[in-house]
Amino acid sequence: MILVKKIIDKLRPVVIDILSQLGLELFDITLRRERRKLVLRVVIDDPENYVSIRQCEIVSSQIGNYLDEADLIDSSYILEVSSPGLDRPLREMKDYNRFVGRLAKIWLKDGKVLVGNIKETTENTVSIELKNGEIITFSFDQIKKGKLEIDF
């Protein structure tokens, strides 16, 4: 586990640099053994738009080239580059700001689960409009977790 952390700690700034040159952001990076194979999973985000397959290909190629040269991982591995997805987690206040108007599911620390459109945000509050039209406002600190819902 310590070795995995060292690899991620060395790789993270390189990945962030690659992404920033492309106008992208790092959403998550993990390295773990899955079914006897080592999987390096890099999740990227485009703060202005959705991540395209082409962007994933470019990032994968650049990270792969770096890993080949740096020889950070001494065994065979699988590199996966993807986006957070349509039902992406909402982890920071900036995520709620970005997705005003979108359908979300939000779990509050008091056990309530809310599903509705993100109506409005302030510096530290989120307002969500439920299907019945009721608007509920709560502080970001009250949120346990949240994610976008796919709206059909």
Curated annotation (Swiss-Prot):
Gene Ontology biological process: ribosomal small subunit assembly; translation
Similarity section: Belongs to the RimP family.
Gene3D superfamilies assigned to the protein according to its UniProt record, in alphabetical order: RimP-like superfamily, N-terminal
A Pfam cross-reference name: RimP_N
GO terms under cellular component: cytosol
Source domain of life: Bacteria
Role according to the record: Required for maturation of 30S ribosomal subunits.
Subcellular location: Cytoplasm
Keywords in alphabetical order: Cytoplasm, Ribosome biogenesis
UniProt name for this protein: Ribosome maturation factor RimP
Species: Pseudothermotoga lettingae (strain ATCC BAA-301 / DSM 14385 / NBRC 107922 / TMO) (Thermotoga lettingae)
Coiled-coil region: none
